[in-house]
């Protein structure tokens, strides 16, 4: 039987996450032992989404195409090549099956066509930390308040999963100061398909290590290391001995086959250490290394960015390129064309949840900025709000026709980050820029 006469239907192991413009296929969303390398999302544009939602086993592939084309007054003949290519791809990825006769199959869905719902969530388990880092955007410390209860955490995790979230990140503060850190770690690894664990690496205990080993096929552990010089790292992190303990943890986890990504916060004292840090990371056995300049949020506002000097910036860019060329197997670089999205998705595709239940678009947004409280407010009231719709529709400065780019002294700072665009308007400019005005974000600037 030719594919045209067969009856396509979405597999029961696939969930269609609906968005206002298209959707996402969540493959194997129920299987709890999917490895990081095997788990995947498939983005659907509006047409592909509408076609998939017709695939319930009751119509032939040919009938589905004809119905879809009739909606838009198009000829099936003009679309059949890419359509049947898509069907073959979906079949190869086990998203659909092709039946020989009509039979009704229910399509499992999450999300909404009316408003965006997130696919990824970051949980801040606590704002407490055993360190007091010089650049911390949350201004965490041993004295900081805020720790989510295990009961509230599980309730929230269940709600997020049921509404489409399949990947998550757990962070702090420092997650391992939470009294129920291991129970939470076990819960998220059973619940979600991909889990990132962010830690400073100074509080790793045997029980935590055993859990990470058990779930290593779906875990990425992110650990901060900021210098090859122990004194520089310890001073930056606010505790003597933290460098040695962090290096020990990186090696320990790596030796047990756990994927470790080391992150470096770059500032004036360590900016010429990136090469040596990459080598150090490789020697410790980690699989990935990333670095970012300290952002001017939280305590980071007090740290001066040294590359504001044009000549210094030029020299650093040359140095950086040499490092990337030498360690391209270790430093993940996203091709520019893959960055060309309207925005990063903060606030609608991914969210951050504080220990108090306050929802922020991303970790760098100030603690006072809230889209709503997920412990008390309904899902719809949070994500169907005018603010979330505004963030979903906003073009990041780099990709907005309203950004003056070449004429703006802040274009390099803002780049593809709409938070930095908001931040520059709130703290670095005398007047609201054309990007913020035309993207209708003037009121959001005042919330930062």
Swiss-Prot record:
Q: Binding of [4Fe-4S] cluster 2: at which residues?
A: 408, 414, 417
Superkingdom assignment: Bacteria
Q: Which SMART domains match?
A: Elp3
Question: Among its keywords, does the record have Translocase?
Answer: no
GO terms, molecular function: 4 iron, 4 sulfur cluster binding; metal ion binding; oxidoreductase activity
Textual note on the cofactor: Binds 2 [4Fe-4S] clusters. One cluster is coordinated with 3 cysteines and an exchangeable S-adenosyl-L-methionine, the other is coordinated via 3 cysteines and maybe direct contact with the SboA precursor.
Copy out the induction comment: Transcription is highly induced by oxygen limitation and is under dual and independent control of Spo0A-AbrB and ResDE.
GO terms under cellular component: cytoplasm
Using the record's annotation, list all stretches that form the Radical SAM core domain.
Answer: 115-329
Question: Which residues bind [4Fe-4S] cluster 1 per the record?
Answer: 129, 133, 136
Q: What is its main location?
A: cytoplasm
Per UniProt, which keywords does this protein have? 4Fe-4S, Antibiotic biosynthesis, Bacteriocin biosynthesis, Cytoplasm, Iron, Iron-sulfur, Metal-binding, Oxidoreductase, S-adenosyl-L-methionine
Which Gene Ontology biological process is one annotated for this entry? Answer: bacteriocin biosynthetic process
What happens after mutating residue 309 to N?
In strain: ATCC 6633
* Matching InterPro entries: 4Fe4S-binding_SPASM_dom, Aldolase_TIM, Elp3/MiaA/NifB-like_rSAM, PQQD, PqqD_sf, Radical_SAM_PqqE_MftC-like, rSAM
The entry's localization annotation reads: Cytoplasm
- What Pfam families does UniProt report for this protein, alphabetically? PqqD, Radical_SAM, SPASM
Q: What is its EC number?
A: 1.21.98.-
Q: Name the cofactor(s) required for activity, per the record.
A: [4Fe-4S] cluster
Function, as annotated: Catalyzes the formation of 3 thioether bonds during production of the sactipeptide subtilosin from SboA. In vitro the thioether bonds cannot be made in the absence of the SboA propeptide, suggesting this is the first reaction in subtilosin maturation. In vitro, in the absence of a second substrate, cleaves S-adenosyl-L-methionine into Met and 5'-dA.
| Protein name per the record | Antilisterial bacteriocin subtilosin biosynthesis protein AlbA
Species: Bacillus subtilis (strain 168)
The opening ranks of the lineage are:
Bacteria, Bacillati, Bacillota, Bacilli, Bacillales
């Amino acid at each position: 039987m030719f594919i045209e006469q067969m009856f396509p239907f979405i597999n029961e192991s696939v969930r269609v996450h609906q968005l206002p413009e298209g959707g996402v296929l969540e493959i194997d969303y129920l299987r709890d032992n999917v490895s990081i390398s095997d788990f995947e999302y498939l983005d659907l544009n509006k047409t592909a989404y509408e076609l998939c939602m017709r695939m319930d086993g009751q119509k032939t592939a040919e009938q589905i195409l004809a119905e879809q084309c009739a909606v838009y007054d198009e000829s099936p003949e003009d679309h059949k090549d890419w359509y049947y290519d898509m069907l073959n791809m979906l079949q190869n990825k086990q998203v659909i099956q092709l039946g020989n006769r009509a039979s009704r199959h229910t399509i499992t869905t999450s999300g909404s066509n009316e408003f965006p719902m997130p696919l990824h969530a970051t949980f801040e388990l606590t704002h407490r930390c055993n360190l007091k880092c010089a650049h911390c955007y949350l201004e965490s410390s041993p004295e900081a308040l805020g720790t989510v209860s295990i009961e509230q955490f599980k309730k929230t995790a269940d709600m997020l999963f049921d509404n489409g979230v399949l990947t998550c990140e757990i962070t702090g503060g420092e997650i391992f100061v939470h009294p129920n850190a291991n129970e939470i770690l076990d819960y998220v690894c059973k619940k979600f398909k991909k889990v990132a664990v962010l830690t400073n690496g100074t509080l790793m205990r045997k029980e935590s290590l055993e859990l990470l080993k058990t779930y290593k096929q779906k875990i990425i552990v992110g650990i901060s290391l900021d210098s090859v010089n122990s004194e520089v790292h310890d001073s930056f992190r606010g505790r003597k001995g933290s460098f040695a303990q962090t290096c020990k943890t990186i090696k320990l986890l790596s030796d047990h086959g756990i994927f470790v990504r080391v992150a470096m916060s770059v500032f004036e004292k360590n900016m010429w250490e990136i090469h040596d840090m990459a080598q150090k990371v490789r020697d410790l056995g980690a699989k990935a290394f990333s670095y970012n300049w300290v952002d001017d949020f939280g305590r980071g506002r007090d740290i001066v960015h040294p590359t504001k000097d044009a000549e210094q910036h030029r020299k650093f860019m040359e140095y950086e390129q040499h490092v990337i060329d030498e360690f391209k197997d270790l430093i993940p670089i996203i091709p520019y064309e893959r960055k060309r999205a309207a925005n990063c998705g903060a606030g609608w595709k991914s969210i951050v949840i504080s220990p108090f239940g306050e929802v922020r678009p991303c970790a760098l947004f100030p603690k006072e900025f809230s889209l709503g409280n997920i412990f008390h407010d309904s899902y719809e009231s949070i994500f169907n709000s005018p603010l979330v719709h505004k963030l979903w529709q906003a073009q990041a400065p780099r990709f907005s026709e309203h950004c003056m780019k070449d004429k703006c002294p802040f274009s390099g700072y803002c780049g593809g980050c709409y938070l930095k665009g908001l931040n520059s308007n709130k703290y670095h400019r005398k007047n609201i820029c054309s990007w913020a005005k035309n993207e209708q974000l003037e009121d959001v600037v005042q919330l930062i």
